[in-house]
């Protein structure tokens, strides 16, 4: 199928924008590549240190077997990462069977936003992405590895690992998922209880029971937030094996897919005939395919910030106009909570990513001619994995949706566009996701209420101060102010106001959770208020117009442009819960519209 003109045009624009940076990047990774095992270039003393704890040290010292490094984000705090506890032993066995040696190169931190939501620790969350990239870089700097396996799932972990994989772009990279937990209490029922609690209609016991029935076992949370958007992204970009993203943990199929991933890591090193450095996978076309997947699935707005940071590490420069233009051409094909009632397990059972990729390829809406760890183009990602004894066999995937309430073809989508809109106006530049927002709420014009943090909003709500249509402005939430915490804990509060019949919207230089849904939210507004951005000039009572249809965000006050910005007071977020250690990050973080990066 001929590539759609808009996808072709955006790809060419990215390629031209990135010409110099991508060329420099490719030259860098070419210089870093060496013939022979990576470890062979170390001195005997260096090598002895590297092999000292290994049972197969003789193989490592005397043979050309590839050595696979594991970078793991295992901990018990994240249900999504707990299954990784047993992966190193499984990977070692699989590696040895494939003629390779295996070492855990290092661990990286992994933070659960579900635990820190609305807490001071959330102000470390975004920066943890760059810490993860740095930690993975330290692990790989031993320069002993012919390929790398990256074990990570959740919000900042995958982006951080991709930044590291791109930085060490001469090293082949395979990403190994852990899979979603089995379905528990339906996400919409959990959300209803949260709103009831926010409204004072149920107590803490009812809320706790609902939360624990929803988050109940090892594996990724089942709603389609940032973690599961990451898993989609890795498959659409060719860094996962086909059909591996949404297979439940601790199952024979999950284990067999992990083994297959190890085999690919052993096969694509420079020691064989199929050398595939990570930097060759992470090109302009791969990032466009990732954005296409984000739009077709209605994925997390956090990736609008993470993808530019990931791409920059590979010399590719993305802009939010690229997201907007792709969204205008790619239809919304899935309804997964918060954009629908289904969870990711239901989505996978309905045909999942394989069906979706097949549809998008047939419509010319994604690039087929890309390099993937599977050794195929994207057509190989229409296949579904099946167990054949203890081995994986890929079979042709479904060409029809198995549940059109969850997954639809390109010809009959849930919406004509992907639902992500670029916003521009005198309040700055940002984005809004409207795939779960009712059409009558795409345009909101109302008076502003100004807040400096989300707790102030909740206090005003409890005091009964919201009695008319309101634009809730929460400013000083950008990366340089307080690390840009998610404002997801506002969702139940604003949803209650909306259910009471008020027209409400959020405008912020902060960000929302990938689980946020039905309330209009203009997010990532840049320049941020703490650097003197326009949000710092808004006053209580100003009339603001948020128009997602036209893509505009404006303060209508006549004297707006002549006002002096309110100064930011960093005292409330400069220390406590580790925040003092991240002052250097806050001082140099880039704007949200460019990835909010520290190390890229």
Residue ranges of model-derived segments:
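A short, small-residue-rich loop immediately preceding and capping a beta-strand
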Residues: 140-161, 172-176
